[in-house]
Amino acid sequence: DVMDLLTVNQEKCLRCGICVECCPSCILSMGENGPECNFDRGCMSCGQCVAICPVGALDNKYTPLAEQRPVTMPLPTPEVAYEFLRMRRSVRNFKPQAPTDEEITRMLDVARYAPTAGNSQGMYYIVIRDREQIRAIADAVANWMEAEVAAGTENKRYFQVVLRAYRERGQDIIARNAPCLIFALARRLNITGVSNAEQSWAYAELFAPTIGLGTTIAGFIQSCGIARSEERRVGKECRSRWS
């Protein structure tokens, strides 16, 4: 029922229309008694209408006003924010001990506040702390690189350098001897899944140093996963076409 989505405190409502203007789904309009929803199924549960109301007159059953937590701490100054973002560095030399469950949970809890297209969210995370599994993943990536070298792809020369370090010198420049790997995943049919995952991880890795953790983006592992996924897609299309 479209009448059940919004609750308007008519004594507070200014009828300024800012909630209507800011609704990303364009499903609100201004009526005689305040904002009205024209199509509740179009609501993406972003809570923008509730958050933007200057007098707290609007409630949304998907994002209840009573469950909102105001930010009480002072915001960082522009100078502090600039220096915080500027100091971001990848860590490529990790301590042997893996982060605790609590530390990982705190980091990924922050990640869920990252913007996602259409407020789609729907992120999944796989956390791996088993050393043998991490080594097996790095080995699988090295095997993929060897196949790329044999095929003479555009990355051949670069991968040869990586493989010499990994295979001959025993230098793990694929997983960096990290005690923990975290994979950010989205549903395959989510066309913005990759960008959602990248933005979520950006939040996580910016937060990590505040609890004493270091992070890096495992680009070789990511590239291997993307390449293998594309190979499977092409293979599936070919099988479909010729079967």
Task: Identify the function of each model-found stretch.
Residues 127-197:
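Glycine/small-residue-rich phosphate/adenosyl-binding loop
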